[in-house]
Amino acid sequence: MGLVPLDSEEPPMDMERIINRVTDKQHLGPDAQVDDKALVFVPSDPALTDPFLALVEDWFSKPGFEWHPHRGLETVTTVVDGVLEHGDNLGHAGALEPGEVQWMTAGRGIIHRELAYRDEHAHVLQMWLNLPAAKKLTPSRYQDLTRAAMPRIETPGVRIDVHAGTVDGVTGAADTHHPVQGLVATLDPESSYTLQVPPEHRLFAYVMNGRLLIAGRELHAGRTGWSDPVESPAPTTLHLMATDPDHPARVMIYSGTPLREPVALGGPFVMNTKDEIAQAFTDFHGGTFGPVPRTARLAYDR
């Protein structure tokens, strides 16, 4: 047996991710704003979901979500079905179709609304993404990730819409304030895919439809698998396989670097201290966020 030169070290192999815990969607039913609502996850313990705060699934026709404020976070809204009409008090307005995403940075303060176009129907998933303390009061902005601007990865039996970050060399259109990778993947029956994930990221995988084997754990629609950051000199991988022989599976997967900062929650505001929450309410009621618009509904012409 020959000697191996000391300087011929092979690069470290990718580490396979595990699912550390699983959470179940909580169905709430209709309320004054929506026809139906479910909480995919909520910030009962923000340290376990950091940097993600909440993921809510809504089905609505009328009234939807009329004018309301936000500060200190980003909302990432994926249209599952129907058409979502949106607008804000900075003059932005638009309408998004199935598969498209609205990435709104509330930052220092914004007033916006989200409605079903023509009061017909909208089915959306809205995630609340925390902002670092240094970016809590960053200027507000909108990013509409339309089909035309959204890159897609296609391999045999797999279609992946990349929202943010870089997946297999394909970079999503969202400009993010801290490292985040996000996608929605559709896998045909018994198809599989291996996703590379930065080791420092916390990851969630929400099964929207069907059944999936995720990192060796089978999850069905309505369940979310969580994978915590790991120490590894190489990228980590998450293996996916659609296990239902008759139906495809669809999954939303987001990962991001935990902020590891205090979280203070107050209605539509997310800051680092209770005093900052109180200031947000004072600023909103004092008009600092600007006036509530009185604009007419959109003329949807896409």
PLM segments and residue spans:
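Jelly-roll (double-stranded beta-helix
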Residues: 1-302
